[in-house]
Design a protein with these regions (language model features):
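Residues on the lipid-exposed face of transmembrane beta-strands in outer-membrane beta-barrel proteins
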Residues: 42-44, 82-88, 128-132, 146-148, ...
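Short loop/turn motifs that connect adjacent beta-strands in outer-membrane beta-barrel proteins
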Residues: 28-38, 135-142, 189-194, 223-224
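Predominantly the C-terminal beta-signal and adjacent terminal strand-loop region
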Residues: 209-210, 214-260
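Transmembrane beta-barrel strands of outer-membrane/channel proteins
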Residues: 42-48, 86, 95-99, 144-150, ...
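Short glycine/proline- and aromatic-enriched beta-strand/turn motifs that initiate or cap beta-hairpins
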Residues: 21-96
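Solvent-exposed loop/turn segments connecting transmembrane beta-strands
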Residues: 74, 138, 201-213
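Extracellular/periplasm-exposed beta-strand and loop segments of Gram-negative cell-envelope proteins
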Residues: 51-77, 97-125, 151-176, 205, ...
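Residues that define the transmembrane beta-barrel architecture of outer-membrane proteins
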Residues: 36-38, 76-80, 122-126, 140, ...
Length: 260
């Protein structure tokens, strides 16, 4: 029941699934150089995040949630995460898509009746941002970006009692958008095939929302593309109807980049 309550709290403020933003990488041992031809990349990735958060109303705490990566994984029904990027010269455009479907069913005896609660949370997050290369050299690339992040979340909880033959359903929907700006890039480690990808952004949007994300890690180039492992953090705060919601997601993300 404790995990169910934690998941119900997550339903109030977006939960789960996260947005990891893998860095653009090259098949060579140095940062990709600028060209006047269109270049594309597709990066599927996975993020094993833990979730901590709190919710308060008029400065009075209404509850907290703390889910380990194992908790999130055990409740995960379906997930899809990818980045698609296009680049021509110094100009670029990327799309980061995340979909998560979490569900949990618990039961508890209330008197002589057995009460079951089934919670399902679906969340889609999209980031679309044009970017411009500020610095480009054989070993270092720095891109500036300005774009938007959108999030759609639907939570449904169904209470049922087989003994009493009664069912009740509650659902909520949340849609929020934010303008984000930030930097991303990579350092190549000498003449080796290893590099350091990095990313940071911050933005504001609807319902007095604030969001930020940052990651730092290590990657390696191969003939077919790149593999990266990063430590990733995403933070959200928004204030609908005098209610303050804080959500922090942190964990390791692994990504594979394919270029064409």
């Amino acid at each position: 029941m404790k995990k169910c309550l934690s998941l119900l709290l997550c339903n109030l403020f977006l939960a789960a699934a996260a947005q990891a933003q893998p860095a653009t990488t090259s098949a060579t041992t140095q940062a990709p150089m600028l060209t006047d031809q269109w270049k594309f990349s597709v990066t599927p990735y996975a993020w094993g995040m833990g979730i901590t958060g709190s919710i308060s109303h008029n400065d009075k705490s209404l509850g907290e949630v703390k889910l380990t990566p194992g908790d999130v994984l055990s409740d995960l029904k379906l997930a899809a995460m990818f980045v698609a990027e296009a680049r021509n010269g110094r100009l670029g455009l990327y799309l980061d898509g995340v979909y998560g479907d979490l569900g949990q069913t618990t039961s508890k005896a209330v008197g002589r009746a057995d009460l079951q609660a089934s919670t399902n949370l679906r969340m889609t997050m999209l980031t679309l941002a044009p970017n411009y290369t500020l610095q480009d050299s054989p070993s270092f690339r720095l891109d500036g970006l300005i774009g938007a992040r959108f999030m759609w979340q639907n939570a449904t909880t169904t209470f049922s009692s087989p003994d009493l033959k009664q069912t009740a359903t509650e659902s909520s929907n949340l849609q929020i958008g934010a303008v984000v700006a930030g930097l991303k890039g990579r350092f190549d480690l000498g003449s080796s095939k290893y590099f350091v990808p990095f990313y940071v952004d911050a933005g504001v949007g609807q319902s007095s929302s604030f969001t930020s994300q940052a990651y730092l890690g290590i990657g390696r180039t191969f003939d077919w593309g790149d593999v990266s492992l990063v430590a990733k953090n995403v933070y959200y705060q928004f204030k609908p109807y005098n209610t303050t919601v804080d959500l922090n997601m942190f964990g390791a993300a692994i990504a594979a980049t394919f270029r064409f």
